[in-house]
């Protein structure tokens, strides 16, 4: 019974090997994240007599190369939440923080939790890949928003309000009607210098070429508004270049966002819980994969309260002696990305109001009681997660063991 504790960092790790009753098999030593370094670690672990289990923290992306290579060598590997390791066995007045001490602490954790350790597997790699894509998706969403605001700021000086003319959603390739319109009619003079009939014909041909729906009344409305607008920048080659560059940057970010959205859905469809999650109200091909990416493997949660605590939407507790606080904010100690996705799901439920959905009924009830926005949204997220946990766990338990 050998517990291998690995404190992972960028490019290298500290390893300690222990047995029960504090027996040190190998004092903390350093390995590099290279082929030779990992192979030497595998040989050392295999040379130690008895069963060995390896535990490491899933910190950032650093641990993945070790977890993957050690699993490929048919060793038992378990990647744990750093918070669980940090809170383990803190019974000393001294505060010691070093890589060597952390490696020993992880090894002691492995011994204490030996029977409950969950083995890292190929499905974990798929989930990690999905989570990485989701974080990239979030990054490019922020980038797209910044590029959109930048373009609108420039257009306010050449064609004020053009971004409000169309509200159609983005296409699968990321293109949007208002952006394509602004790329062609980048200055108000591009519209009002033509006669009404000439603009209608030009706009109709543009819609046909770009495969957008044409409306004559909309064309007349656009032309009428253009007559009243006052631009700041003149209609010249430099202004056109500035706008074209801003449009290209926004289109590039939009294309990346939509391709990631599609790729995430394809990857998420390989997970066993995919059909159950996609059947839930408020969840679609965009939010569903995001939920699965951030929640991960449901089987690692022992009960419903564990998954709500992981998301940070569980009610806080503040009691001491005879004092008991009645209204306590939620813990917010979990994943902020998961809370954001849950709030988006709640927003979809409020907008679509499916009357037969228990989460929407709960949200509607709390709103009717006059609860503040964040109170009923957080309470709804809590209820949604509990239902998610129950349905997914029940479905997974019904599947044949592989």
Model-derived regions, located:
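A detector of single, family-specific signature residues
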Residues: 1-402
């Amino acid at each position: 019974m050998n517990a291998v504790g690995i404190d992972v960092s960028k490019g290298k790790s500290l390893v300690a090997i222990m047995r029960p009753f504090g027996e040190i098999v190998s004092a903390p030593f350093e390995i590099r994240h290279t082929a030779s370094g990992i192979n030497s670690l595998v040989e050392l672990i295999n040379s130690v007599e008895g069963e060995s289990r390896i535990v490491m923290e899933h910190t950032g992306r650093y641990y993945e190369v070790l977890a993957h290579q050690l699993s490929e060598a048919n060793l038992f590997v378990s990647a744990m939440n750093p918070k669980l390791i940090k809170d383990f066995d803190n019974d000393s007045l001294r505060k010691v923080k070093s890589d060597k001490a952390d490696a020993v602490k992880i090894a002691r954790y492995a011994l204490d939790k030996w029977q409950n350790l969950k083995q890292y597997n190929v499905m974990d790699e798929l989930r990690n890949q999905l989570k990485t894509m989701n974080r990239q998706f979030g990054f490019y969403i922020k980038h797209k928003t910044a590029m959109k605001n930048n373009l609108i700021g420039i257009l306010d000086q050449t064609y004020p309000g053009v971004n409000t003319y169309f509200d159609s959603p983005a296409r699968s390739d990321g293109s949007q009607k208002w952006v394509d319109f602004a790329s062609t009619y980048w200055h108000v003079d591009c519209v009002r210098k033509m006669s009404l009939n000439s603009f209608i014909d030009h706009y109709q041909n543009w819609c046909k070429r770009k495969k957008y729906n044409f409306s004559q009344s909309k064309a007349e409305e656009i032309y009428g508004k253009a007559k009243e607008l006052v631009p700041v920048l003149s209609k010249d080659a430099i202004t056109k270049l500035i706008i074209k560059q801003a449009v290209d940057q926004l289109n590039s970010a939009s294309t990346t966002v939509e391709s990631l959205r599609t790729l995430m859905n394809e990857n998420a469809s390989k997970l066993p819980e995919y059909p159950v999650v996609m059947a839930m109200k408020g969840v679609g091909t965009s939010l569903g994969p995001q939920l699965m990416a951030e929640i991960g493997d449901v089987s690692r949660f022992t009960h419903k309260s564990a998954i709500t605590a992981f998301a940070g939407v569980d009610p806080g507790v503040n009691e001491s002696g005879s004092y008991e606080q009645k209204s306590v904010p939620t813990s917010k100690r979990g994943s902020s990305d998961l809370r954001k996705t849950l709030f988006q799901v709640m927003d979809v439920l409020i907008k679509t109001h499916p009357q037969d959905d228990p989460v929407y009924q709960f949200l509607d009830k709390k709103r009717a009681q006059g609860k503040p926005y964040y109170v009923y949204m957080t309470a709804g997220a809590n209820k949604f997660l509990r239902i998610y946990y129950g349905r997914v766990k029940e479905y997974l338990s019904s599947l044949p063991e592989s």
